[in-house]
Amino acid sequence: MGYYRRRYGERVQKLVLDAGFSCPNRDGTVGWGGCSYCDNAAFHPGYSTPGKALLAQIEEGIEFQRVRYPRVRHYLGYFQAYSNTYGTLERLRRAYEEELSHPEVVGIVIGTRPDCVDEEKLDYLSGLAGGRVLKGWRRTFGGSGIDGGWANERSADSGSGANGGWANERSADSGSGANGWRADDRSANDRSVNSIITNSRSTNDRSTSSRRTSSRSTNSIITNSISTNGISTNSISTNNGSADGGLPEGKTIDAPIVVVEYGIESCYDATLRRINRGHDFECARRAVEMTAERGLDTGAHFILGLPGETREMLLDQCDAISSLPLRSVKFHQLQIVKGTAMEKEYAADPSAFYRPGLDEYLDFVIDILERLRPDLYIERVAGEVPPRFVNDTPWGLVRNFEILRMLDRRMEERGARQGRLFSQ
């Protein structure tokens, strides 16, 4: 059960959206060419394409989700492609408020760079989350879903979900891209997917939960439920949302859920320069602090195995990650995507990259979890792209549920738990 189900009494699914934004390190503002590892097409579901109207993307996304999640009724629009605060405030308002006008959408997740926010934009997002922007906006969880004004108008059957193709084992909550892989990605040659997602069905399915409350957010109560192995994820909840700060059935919210998710990628400035990010870690710290100060749910994304970073460096950066006022963190292993500058760099010097095998990666992830703050929600521990975008699949034919079972067993074998080695 998910973080949102615990808070709102039902599962809430993400819909990946493309609003046509760009990045300042692509257009010459702070650099050219973008991040050296990035090909955004590798992270797009089929329904989310630039130039398509947002409401059309939402409708197609709901239909896309329908088979897998037939009981889901509410969605978060996930602005994922490129930097989704890189534009004028007026442009941002148009995009966000169009998305929030859909009767089955209950909130917004904004993926962006730390150098693409300012006080004005964050104040607007704070007003959006605080109910000061969309007057009369309402959504009802767990009840009939019918309310006045902006409220939900569809029946329970109409707002549901499914993933297709290779994404059959994935949750859109993971938010990392290619959950809309084409049928041709499922060919015999391509079935060696080299990566996985820890999604909203993660360790809670196998855990005995004990609940711990965190109150870092000024506008919400965040309750962690720790499994027997101690992973703090956003996928653990009560059944009806009425306990631990969740909402009872039929409860109405008068303001949308707003989450800001920063691509930080590394805590090392030398790495950020090497991959052409165009900002330093101090910029990321300032952005996270400015966002959290406004009571906004704040998340971050990190890549494990960027060139020049050793295993020891990646473990050492856990202290820096824990020092940030984050609610959630996503990790994924570096994947060498075809046609990127990173592909050329890897071909020239593979020894500069830490690319562990699957067995070593499990222990590595556990070592990271043990060093992180115990109240951080871990939304993802690995990532995946369609096989057609990569040349190698070093982990072979391994699916998500298998990886999750492996990770859970390994943590139990080691007696590991998130935060065990964390020291304030």
Q: What are these model-derived regions, one by one?
A:
Residues L89-E97, D118-A129, L314:
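Distinct, well-ordered alpha-helical segments
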Residues Y96-E97, T310-R327, E384-R405:
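Short, electropositive alpha-helical surface patch
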Residues G107-I110, D118-S144, G149, E153, ...:
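Radical SAM/AdoMet-radical enzyme domain recognition
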Residues G136-G142, E153, E282-M342, D359-A382:
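Conserved C-terminal portion of the radical SAM core fold
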